Structures are given as C-alpha cells and as structure tokens.
C-alpha cells in the first residue's frame, strides 16, 4: 500500500510511490498474477480484541479508517451516536477467508456446529456497515451498497444525497475490502501480471 493514514498516503503521492509489490501468498498458491497492493498493518494493534472477533480484515481496515476520520474531524461521541448521524459503507463482498474457514470446518467435522456465531457478521454482504454501526453506536441511517469496484464511490455519493435531502447532518461513507488469496482466486486465476509497477491495460 502507499500508507496507513492520510499523512503517509499524501507523502507517497507526492513522491509518486507505487504500493504494488510481489505477493508471496499468491505466488505460493500458483497464481499467474503475483502482485498486489499489500497492506502492512497489524489490525490487532488498532482494533479492540472484543470488537475484532466479529470482523474480517476488510471490516477491520474500515474500522481503523473510520477511527482516523473521527479524530481528523474532531467529532464527539455525542455527535457520532446521534439520530442525525448515519453511515453508508460497503464492500464488494463478504470476508472470503472467513467463508473458506467455515467451509473447512464443515468438511472436517461433517457438521456446521463448530463454525460459531462470530462467522455471521464476517460473512454478511453488509459486513462493513454492520460492524461499524455496532462499534460506533450509529443511530442514523445505516446500510451497505455493493457494486463491485464502484462500491465505495456509490456509498459516498449516496451519503452526500442524505445530507442534501436533509435526512442526515453527518455521514460516514466509504468501504473496505480484504486482500486475501481466497478473494483473488475469483478473478485473478487466469490473469498474468509480473511487473508490480506496470498496470494492466
């Protein structure tokens, strides 16, 4: 990636830095494309353990971004948890790594009993909005929009509409996605990219 906060991203953009590097996991699984914008971040250092139990990596990244946004905006707890404060945030899909784990549990035990309740919020298509709204006690509108690679942009546009229509005063908007080989195999299994800094056209 090109940074884990606004300052790091800003500096990387000024320097023309590329965040695309070789991904060893993708190489070990035999992907023809073995490059990615890997995120160098230990989410457990930024999200409480109790909260993290319900999240896949994508939701955790969104949680960290929302925390940073709140601090940047100087919002109070009363302003965040208010009926005039809402949230529209999504992802292209659920946590595919969590879905694979659940599948492996069923295959191993020939039963879904050991999957556990924490898999539910990880595997919902609304995992981002559900996790963020719960963690930050959002009382206004709260839902996800899923539209593949345009998800975050559509969420932000929809959030602006809520303010323009005078339905909300403050909106949290955007999205989050996990970077895992289980997600990559759905669309990168046949694409070949070998040069990290050279985009596919």
Where are these regions (language model features)?
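Conserved beta-ketoacyl condensing-enzyme motif
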Residues: 8-9, 14-147, 176-184
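Short conserved active-site loop signatures built around small residues
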Residues: 152
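Active-site histidine-anchored catalytic micro-motif
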Residues: 155
């Amino acid at each position: 990636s090109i940074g884990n906060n606004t300052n790091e991203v800003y500096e990387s953009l000024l320097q023309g830095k590329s965040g695309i590097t070789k991904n060893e996991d993708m190489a070990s699984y035999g992907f023809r494309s073995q490059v990615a914008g890997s995120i160098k971040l230990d989410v457990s250092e930024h999200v409480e353990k109790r909260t993290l139990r319900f999240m896949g990596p994508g939701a955790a990244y969104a949680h960290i971004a929302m925390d940073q946004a709140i601090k940047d905006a100087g919002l109070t707890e009363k302003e965040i948890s208010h009926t005039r404060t809402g949230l529209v945030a999504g992802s292209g899909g659920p946590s595919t790594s969590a879905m694979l784990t659940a599948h492996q549990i069923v295959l191993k035990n020939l039963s879904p009993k050991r999957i556990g309740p924490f898999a539910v919020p990880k595997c919902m298509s609304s995992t981002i909005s559900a996790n963020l709204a719960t963690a930050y006690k959002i009382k206004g509108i709260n839902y996800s929009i899923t539209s593949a690679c345009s998800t975050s942009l559509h969420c932000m546009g929809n959030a602006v509409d809520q303010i323009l229509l005078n339905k909300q005063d403050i909106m949290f908007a955007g999205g989050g996605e996990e970077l895992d080989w289980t997600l990559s195999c759905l669309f990168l299994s046949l694409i070949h990219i070998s040069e990290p800094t050279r985009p596919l056209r």
